[in-house]
């Protein structure tokens, strides 16, 4: 049918007017004029004449267009009977469409009359063709008169008709996915084609309608070669959206309303969908990163939440704080405390904090992700009490560093049972007072652990108001167990199988806890075993300063232990911190000697143990002549001071073992130290009178 129609096609405008309406519609379909089945005869003649003027430019790219255009079926021409059913009056089209395109409709004839390049004229005229029915009827006469003088060879129209056959298929929506759809009428095929090809006609229609794309002129890309834009998918998608809008105007109102709505909803093409998908993927990625989020579980409370009270020691770090619920070392059940809450309640490191948390049921605190283990801690909801007192916002607290230190004035008596010789010997040769800073200098295997246990039990027996803290650093696990079972006090331990950081962390938090108690006016006694091992731990954990002392001791590693030991003091208006620390000597290590030399002059009380006595199994192995207390007259009465000085004069003339044997034998013969001093005073005076 295509061949016969092309042979009967006239070569001028007058011949077009003599054809019947069905023949004009078939010719318009071959030439690729959109909406030809719905035009009147005069409009068809005008559209065909306008289209024929751009033929010379189209022939130049015929080969390229034939390679790019999709293959079309042989019989695609709409029947003539479909024209009367699909024809719609121009008055039914929206008036806003006509006003919006008024400038575009008048630009094409002017460009052709002024001698513009044929490519621009053809672009403007092909844009005008599907819109011509929306203009007034009197315009068709002027356009027809201009077209009668412009004839084109029939061969050019034939080649252009073949090239436009595939384009018309995409324009009219008559490209069928099955062979049985060719017999449908033009209107039904048009509407069905719109629905079937809606998903993928963006790319196909873009290649077929680039010549008629009304936006190509606005884009301004390759104006002189209009066919170059057929390879641009972006312009093709623009053309598909424009053409769908035109067909929604020309398609009548029976199904056009639903078609318009569906086409508006599906207007985004593949590129738009891809952009949305990429945006959604980015948002999902941000959400996943947000879920990884903080390691602290900060939950909002509701009325139905069940709060669980927790208590522990507050450990304030650089940017956060934790309540150590399992002791003085970090644990999995620690509770997070924000710095804002720390500032609000004036909290300090070492405070005993009590407050509720909102635990999550069935949630594990250990999370595995990203190849590393993360711990998620519950956050403290509020603070109920601090150091046994109700929490107050912005309290006025005493600072430990501003308290006035004094020499010890109140004595801590160690004498309990008459049969316990060790505490009685210490009570005589090295009396201990509240706020004492004492060193127990001991070689290995000299019985320092037994001395510490006896001192702890004696203090707790005679002075129950004192808060006793036994700090064991780098000790044997069995010794820790023995201390926990034998000492009635707070045992804070870090065994030697733990890293050096744990030793230093435990010691720092323990001394800060003691300071907080002293600020409240309490008397605290800290027994440290040992200061030498604590110095070794700081030497390993502290960052190197570059100044190494003899024995491999870093100079900066000695300051934290001295700060720990220097916290001991007697406060002027109440409260005291007593520290008795052991120091190892005669170990054969130069490092131990350096550490001991740093602490030798810092204490105001020294109890020295002897290896020579310990090897002979003489306990307590106390070197009587080398032990003593500074300012002991502040702890003893005047009579006691006189008697002890006389006793020391006698013992200083004896050897180490003889002096200890004499002292212990006299102590065993008496029931108390007071009775012993009475005996010593009588014996010394009597022997002196005999001389």
Swiss-Prot record:
> Which Enzyme Commission number(s) are on file for it?
3.6.4.-
What SMART domains does the annotation carry? AAA, CSP, Rho_N
Bias (Basic and acidic residues) ranges = 50-64, 120-158, 188-273
Share an example GO biological-process annotation for this protein. DNA-templated transcription termination
Classification via CDD domains: rho_factor_C (cd01128)
Q: What GO annotations for molecular function exist for this entry?
A: ATP binding; ATP hydrolysis activity; ATP-dependent activity, acting on RNA; helicase activity; RNA binding
User: Which residues lie within the region annotated Disordered?
Assistant: 48-303
What spans are recorded as compositionally biased (Low complexity)?
A: 65-92, 105-119
Give the UniProt keywords, A-Z: ATP-binding, Helicase, Hydrolase, Nucleotide-binding, RNA-binding, Transcription, Transcription regulation, Transcription termination
SUPFAM superfamilies in the record, alphabetically? Answer: Nucleic acid-binding proteins (SSF50249), P-loop containing nucleoside triphosphate hydrolases (SSF52540)
Tell me which Pfam families the record gives. ATP-synt_ab (PF00006), Rho_N (PF07498), Rho_RNA_bind (PF07497)
Q: Where does ATP bind?
A: 433-438, 445-450, 476
Annotated disulfide bonds: none
On whether Hydrolase is a keyword of this UniProt record, the answer is: yes
Question: InterPro entries in the record, alphabetically?
Answer: AAA+_ATPase (IPR003593), ATPase_F1/V1/A1_a/bsu_nucl-bd (IPR000194), CSD (IPR011129), NA-bd_OB-fold (IPR012340), P-loop_NTPase (IPR027417), Rho-like_N (IPR011112), Rho_factor_ATP-bd (IPR041703), Rho_RNA-bd (IPR011113)
Give the source's domain of life in one word: Bacteria
Q: How does it assemble?
A: Homohexamer. The homohexamer assembles into an open ring structure.
Extract the NCBIfam families matched here: PRK09376.1 (NF006886), rho (TIGR00767)
State the function annotated in the UniProt record: Facilitates transcription termination by a mechanism that involves Rho binding to the nascent RNA, activation of Rho's RNA-dependent ATPase activity, and release of the mRNA from the DNA template.
Q: Which family does it belong to?
A: Belongs to the Rho family.
Protein name stated in the entry? Transcription termination factor Rho
The protein's organism comes out as Micrococcus luteus (Micrococcus lysodeikticus)
């Amino acid at each position: 049918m295509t061949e016969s129609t092309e042979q009967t096609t006239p070569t001028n405008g007058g011949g077009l007017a003599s054809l019947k309406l069905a023949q004009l519609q078939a010719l318009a379909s071959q030439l690729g004029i959109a909406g030809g089945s719905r035009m009147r005869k005069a409009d068809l003649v005008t559209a065909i004449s306008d289209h024929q003027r751009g033929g010379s430019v189209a022939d130049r790219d015929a080969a390229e267009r034939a390679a790019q255009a999709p293959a079309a079926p042989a019989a695609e021409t709409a029947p003539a009977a479909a024209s009367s059913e699909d024809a719609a009056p121009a008055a039914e089209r929206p008036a806003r469409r006509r006003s919006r395109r008024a400038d575009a409709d008048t630009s094409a004839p002017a460009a052709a009359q002024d001698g513009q390049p044929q490519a621009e004229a053809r672009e403007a005229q092909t844009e005008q063709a599907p819109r011509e029915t929306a203009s007034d009827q009197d315009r068709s006469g002027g356009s027809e008169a201009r077209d009668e003088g412009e004839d084109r060879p029939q061969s050019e129209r034939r080649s252009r008709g073949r090239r436009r056959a595939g384009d018309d298929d995409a324009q009219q929506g008559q490209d069928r996915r099955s062979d049985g759809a060719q017999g449908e009428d033009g209107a039904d095929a048009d509407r069905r084609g719109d629905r079937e090809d809606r998903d993928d006609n963006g790319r196909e229609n873009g290649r077929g309608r680039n010549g008629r794309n009304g936006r190509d002129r606005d884009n301004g890309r390759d104006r002189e070669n209009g066919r170059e834009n057929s390879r641009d998918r972006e312009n093709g998608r623009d053309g598909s959206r424009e053409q769908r809008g035109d067909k929604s105007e020309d398609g009548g109102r029976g199904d056009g309303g639903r078609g318009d709505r569906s086409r508006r909803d599906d207007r985004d093409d593949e590129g738009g969908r891809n952009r949305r998908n990429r945006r959604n993927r980015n948002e999902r990625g941000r959400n996943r990163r947000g879920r990884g989020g903080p390691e602290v579980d900060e939950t909002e409370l509701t009325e139905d939440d069940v709060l669980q009270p927790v208590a522990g020691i507050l450990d304030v770090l650089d940017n956060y704080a934790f309540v150590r619920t399992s002791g003085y070392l970090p644990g999995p059940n620690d509770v997070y405390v924000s710095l804002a809450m720390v500032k609000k309640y004036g909290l300090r490191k070492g405070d005993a904090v009590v407050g509720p948390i909102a635990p999550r049921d069935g949630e594990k605190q250990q999370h595995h992700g990203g190849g590393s283990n993360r711990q998620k801690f519950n956050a403290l909801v509020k603070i109920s009490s601090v150091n046994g007192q109700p929490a107050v916002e912005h309290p006025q607290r005493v600072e430990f560093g501003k308290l006035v230190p004094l020499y010890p004035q109140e004595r801590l008596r160690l004498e309990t049972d008459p049969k316990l010789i060790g505490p009685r010997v210490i009570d005589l040769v090295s009396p201990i007072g509240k706020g004492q800073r004492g060193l127990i200098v001991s070689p290995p295997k000299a019985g320092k652990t037994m001395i510490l246990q006896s001192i702890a039990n004696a203090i707790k027996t005679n002075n129950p108001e004192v808060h006793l803290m036994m700090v064991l650093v780098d000790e044997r696990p069995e010794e820790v167990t023995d201390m926990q079972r034998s000492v009635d006090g707070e045992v804070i331990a870090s065994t030697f199988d733990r890293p050096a950081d744990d030793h230093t962390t435990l010691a720092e938090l323990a001394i800060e806890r003691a300071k907080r108690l002293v600020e409240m006016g309490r008397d605290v006694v800290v027994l440290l075993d040992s200061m030498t091992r604590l110095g070794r731990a700081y030497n390993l954990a502290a960052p190197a300063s570059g100044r190494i002392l003899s024995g491999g001791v870093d100079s900066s590693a000695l300051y934290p232990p001295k700060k720990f030991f220097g916290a001991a003091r007697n406060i002027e208006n109440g409260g005291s911190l007593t520290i008795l620390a052991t120091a190892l000597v005669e170990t054969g290590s130069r490092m131990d000697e350096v550490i001991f030399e740093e602490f030798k002059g810092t204490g105001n009380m020294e109890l020295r143990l002897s290896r020579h006595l310990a090897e002979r199994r003489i306990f307590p192995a106390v070197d009587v002549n080398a032990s003593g207390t500074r300012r002991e007259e502040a702890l003893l009465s005047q009579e006691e001071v006189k008697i002890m000085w006389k006793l020391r004069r006698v013992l200083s003339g004896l050897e180490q073992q003889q002096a200890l044997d004499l002292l212990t034998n006299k102590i065993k013969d008496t029931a108390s130290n007071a009775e012993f001093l009475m005996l010593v005073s009588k014996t010394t005076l009597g022997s002196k009178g005999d001389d």
